[in-house]
Amino acid sequence: MNGEEQYYAATQLYKDPCAFQRGPAPEFSASPPACLYMGRQPPPPPPHPFPGALGALEQGSPPDISPYEVPPLADDPAVAHLHHHLPAQLALPHPPAGPFPEGAEPGVLEEPNRVQLPFPWMKSTKAHAWKGQWAGGAYAAEPEENKRTRTAYTRAQLLELEKEFLFNKYISRPRRVELAVMLNLTERHIKIWFQNRRMKWKKEEDKKRGGGTAVGGGGVAEPEQDCAVTSGEELLALPPPPPPGGAVPPAAPVAAREGRLPPGLSASPQPSSVAPRRPQEPR
């Protein structure tokens, strides 16, 4: 019961924090009373409901728990060894900081300072071949270890590929996978082979077409048309001799349509004055 009475008495005391500060206040105060600020603050937590347990803890630790004693660092042999070598290292003079070491020329760089290619796959390409010929020499020409070699096809593989190309100039993806499994090749090898084979086939076709047009198909040249027949002026200047019997030359109708006929010729054929001879009957 004593604990409960102390608890309730404490709570009543904390309910009115200004109880001990009530008194005659001065008429003119420079600042408001402190109880106003104390009233705004949250009340402190109530005391522990079991004061006996707290008192036991405050008295001390149980006798069976002994405090841990930390050994001094000087007794540790490893720490003593470090202390033995530490002054010697601190006594070493620091090298002078400068842009270049002593005895080195500014234009010469050391081997570890050379710029290396960051990725190994960059060695397999020829994109950095110019660095070996550069006068600066910062980039050293490295041998191309991972250079891609040319694929050597066997006769059986070439035979199957040629047979497939004979039927299909453009291979499909499922058929390409099937050929890759059957011929023990990759899809990329088959794709590249078909691309090269198509280019070769197109060149052969172009060569065949070019040879046929140069010969002229059957190898027979077409006769050229005479320009004197199509020109009417040249026909008037050089009239052909009339054939016997007064027949009109074949070029006369063309000249008659144009309205230009040589003298002695007419558009219509004239009857011959000489009658044809009849064959004599046998007696």
Curated annotation (Swiss-Prot):
Main localization category: nucleus
GO terms assigned for molecular function: DNA-binding transcription activator activity, RNA polymerase II-specific; DNA-binding transcription factor activity; DNA-binding transcription factor activity, RNA polymerase II-specific; promoter-specific chromatin binding; protein-containing complex binding; RNA polymerase II cis-regulatory region sequence-specific DNA binding; RNA polymerase II-specific DNA-binding transcription factor binding; sequence-specific double-stranded DNA binding
Entries under Gene3D superfamilies matching the protein: Homeodomain-like (1.10.10.60)
Motif mapping: Nuclear localization signal: 197-203
Span of the annotated motif Antp-type hexapeptide: 118-123
Function text: Activates insulin, somatostatin, glucokinase, islet amyloid polypeptide and glucose transporter type 2 gene transcription. Particularly involved in glucose-dependent regulation of insulin gene transcription. As part of a PDX1:PBX1b:MEIS2b complex in pancreatic acinar cells is involved in the transcriptional activation of the ELA1 enhancer; the complex binds to the enhancer B element and cooperates with the transcription factor 1 complex (PTF1) bound to the enhancer A element. Binds preferentially the DNA motif 5'-[CT]TAAT[TG]-3'.
The protein's name in its UniProt record: Pancreas/duodenum homeobox protein 1
Upper taxonomic lineage: Eukaryota, Metazoa, Chordata, Craniata, Vertebrata
Originating gene: PDX1
